C-alpha cells in the first residue's frame, strides 16, 4: 500500500517524537517538499540540524529535535490564500496571534506567512507549527 501524504506523515512523526522526548527523528520517505519545510522550520528555530541520508530507496531525513515544537501538522486541503486572508487562517490553525507560524508555498518558494505578508504575496497553505 502506498503512502497517501508523505508531508503529513513526516510532520506527525516529528510531533510524536517531540511528545515522547526523543532527540532525533528519522523521516522516511524523503522528498524535496519535506526538505524545504524542514529548512523553514530550522530557520525559525523549531528544529536543530537535519541531514539527508541515501538508503538506496527514497532516502531518509535525520532531524535533530530541540524541544521547541508543541504541535505541527499539514494543512489539508491546501487552501489558496490571498495576502489579506492570512489572519483568518492564523485564527483557525494557530493558538494565539503572534504564536507559531504557517508555512506557505508561494511563487517565490516556501516561506512563513509573516514573510509572505511582508512581501505582499499569497500562496497555498502547506503546514502549521507552534
UniProtKB/Swiss-Prot annotation:
- Kindly state which keywords UniProt assigns to this record, in alphabetical order: Ribonucleoprotein, Ribosomal protein, RNA-binding, rRNA-binding
| Protein name, entry field | Small ribosomal subunit protein uS8
**Is this entry keyworded Iron?**
no
What binding partners and quaternary form does the record give?
Part of the 30S ribosomal subunit.
Similarity comment: Belongs to the universal ribosomal protein uS8 family.
What are the GO BP annotations of this UniProt entry? translation
Any single Gene Ontology cellular-component annotation = ribosome
The record's GO molecular-function terms, alphabetically, read: rRNA binding; structural constituent of ribosome
| Superkingdom per UniProt | Archaea
| NCBIfam families found in the cross-reference section | PRK04034.1 (NF003115)
What is the originating organism of this protein?
Answer: Methanococcus voltae
- Identify the Pfam families for this entry: Ribosomal_S8
The record's listing under PANTHER family reads: 40S RIBOSOMAL PROTEIN S15A (PTHR11758)
Query: What functional role does this protein have?
Result: One of the primary rRNA binding proteins, it binds directly to 16S rRNA central domain where it helps coordinate assembly of the platform of the 30S subunit.
